[in-house]
Amino acid sequence: MNKLSTKLVVAIGIGAALYGILGLWGFSIAPNTFIKPALAILTVFGALFGPVAGLLIGLIGHTVTDTIAGWGIWWGWVISSGIIGFAMGFIQKRVGFSVKNGTYNKGDISYLAITGLIGIVIAIIFAGAFDIIVMGEPFDKIVIQVLGATIADVIVFLVLGLPITIGLAKSNKKHTHLKIEK
């Protein structure tokens, strides 16, 4: 089994703390459903540190949010945050892509957008199904929550997560217009 480096463990801790605390803040759009800017943390940290970090940040951070908020831990939604973080981290595995080094192309951005959107949809459907099957929640309530959460997460991903990740990569781009004279 691969060991997690100290740097990765620290990144997971910081990301989970940020995601957990920022997850307490959001705008209500449906029953128990919010637009939460914290989702951008999963995009940025997933792109920086990969799918395992994204998964753990989502799982730990969402557990922190639910614990501090005092409404109990909703495991389906905790797991969905992990799935979203995991999906966001796939981009980090692409050859030539690096937020840290500022190396990316349009294909990388498209890949992040597609894997992020697919991850959000899969995760939210999973959370809804979990709530119906395991938690015994009413179907009609969950349909509203799933639609609201999907729309909210897609908006946050496209308006905050993706642009912040691209901005970080651009700011780290190593380019110069200096030429070596012979």
From Swiss-Prot:
GO terms for cellular component: plasma membrane. It is a multi-pass membrane protein. The chain crosses the membrane at residues 9-29, 40-60, 71-91, 114-134, 142-162. It is found in: Cell membrane. InterPro entries: ECF_substrate-spec-like, UPF0397. Keywords: Cell membrane, Membrane, Transmembrane, Transmembrane helix. Belongs to the UPF0397 family. NCBIfam families: PRK13661.1. This is UPF0397 protein BCAH187_A2708. It comes from Bacillus cereus (strain AH187).
